[in-house]
Amino acid sequence: LFYLNNFRMLLTLFSSCSKNTNSADTIVFNANVWTGDENQKTAQAFAIKGDEILDIGTDEAMQQYKGSNTKMIDAEGKFITPGFIDAHMHLMRSGEMLLNVQLRDAKSPEEFTQRIADFSKTIDAETWITGGSWDQTQWGGEMPRKDWIDGVTPNKPVVVMRMDGHMLLANSAALKIAGVDKNTADIAGGEIIRDANGEPTGLLKDNAMNLLLDIIPAWSEKRKHEILKAASQHLLENGVTSVTDMEGLHPSFQSYETADQLRTANELNIRIYEGAALGDFAKVNKADYKNDKWVKFGLVKGFVDGSLGSRTAAFKYDYSDAPGNKGM
């Protein structure tokens, strides 16, 4: 309902909008506008005042809203649509990945290693290397190991996530700080991947990831603002104006708190529908969270297994490429 109301109010262009004799701040004309209204699917122009659309229609009809200070934008026939909504994302995690090492399109183990080596040179010795979003299918399916990156990051801790968020790779420096070794027991709902000698390979799945994630130094308030702004800007550049965020109360990300701070400072430029993990949802009912057209709580997230790419989704039978593994 939150999305629908705001979509209608701010983005969907309705031909039934009442006429407003006030001058518009902006008029967009000579456009190919998709309205989302079954009664008038397309239009040429629309008028905007503040954060609301005054009217939509023909170029000629919008002239009634033109004032001495109205900004006129010629769309040159381009297609215009209401902003897109991302219905499931991890907002702060996404912003963090934009500002850290990029591994999503690494095409080989060598490129994977080189990107981490290059990024390592751009940060100080105390900074953890995070981000990643790697995908082993880009180079044939072999899972990465800590020895891929230990040589280029002997002293800097590295924790890079797989693209689905259900598995990470840590180097030896990070594992040592976390106290994870061959004697570390597996975590319920998670797994430490080990070699033939029982030594961790650097891969940790689902709940076992918390052994590393929980010890990564907390972000400063300034850094959190930078991360959320980076994510927001990337979304807007791709036409996304509203998101459903799955980690509103996550202690490491603090998405709601950060969004609220930016909203108060008038620096929030996307709408966020916040969700809470199943274990945190009681906090939403007890705390005095503000809910308005910019930030609102409204969902709870829980899951029972994992993902296909990380081989953690639960099946009755073994994975075809991982004998003995039925998931978690």
State what each model feature region is.
Residues L13-S16:
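C-terminal motif of bacterial Sec signal peptides marking the signal peptidase cleavage site
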Residues Y289:
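Polybasic (Lys/Arg-rich)
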Residues L1-F7:
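Bacterial N-terminal signal peptides that target proteins for export
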